[in-house]
Amino acid sequence: MTMTDPIADMLTRVRNANMVRHEKLELPASNIKKEIAEILKSEGFIKNVEYVEDDKQGVLRLFLKYGQNDERVITGLKRISKPGLRVYAKASEMPKVLNGLGIALVSTSEGVITDKEARKRNVGGEIIAYVW
């Protein structure tokens, strides 16, 4: 069976693994998932990202990050633009997540970037998800 929304599946897997405090998780790889994972790593939400080659599409291995006393670094993940209802924003209308404490993942003509980077580069795009 084909997957309708692979990005929502990725976010759900990360959310579920985070809730039960798993150290790592694996998911089917794609280019957009790699870009999202790299942003999560650079913004400090996850520890590391590995790409494992297999006979099919490859596997992304994400290593989740926890603070002192095993507290979660990722408090929330929310899919915004869905296959049935796409959400777009201009650079001037780019949303701030929790007044700048979180990030919005934005798919632009320059690839997947954060809301801060989109404002800086003055590009709009599709709001993929919020992470805080």
UniProtKB/Swiss-Prot annotation:
Subunit note: Part of the 30S ribosomal subunit. Contacts proteins S5 and S12.
Domain of life: Bacteria
GO cellular component terms listed in the entry, alphabetical order: cytosolic small ribosomal subunit
GO molecular function: rRNA binding; structural constituent of ribosome
Family stated for the protein in its record: Belongs to the universal ribosomal protein uS8 family.
Signal sequence segment: none
Name of the protein this chain belongs to: Small ribosomal subunit protein uS8
One Pfam match: Ribosomal_S8
Function per UniProt: One of the primary rRNA binding proteins, it binds directly to 16S rRNA central domain where it helps coordinate assembly of the platform of the 30S subunit.
A single GO BP: translation
NCBIfam families: PRK00136.1 (NF001109)
Keywords: Ribonucleoprotein, Ribosomal protein, RNA-binding, rRNA-binding
Key word Transferase present: no
Species in which this protein is naturally found: Staphylococcus aureus (strain NCTC 8325 / PS 47)
Keyword RNA-binding: yes
HAMAP family listed in its UniProt record: Ribosomal_uS8_B (MF_01302_B)
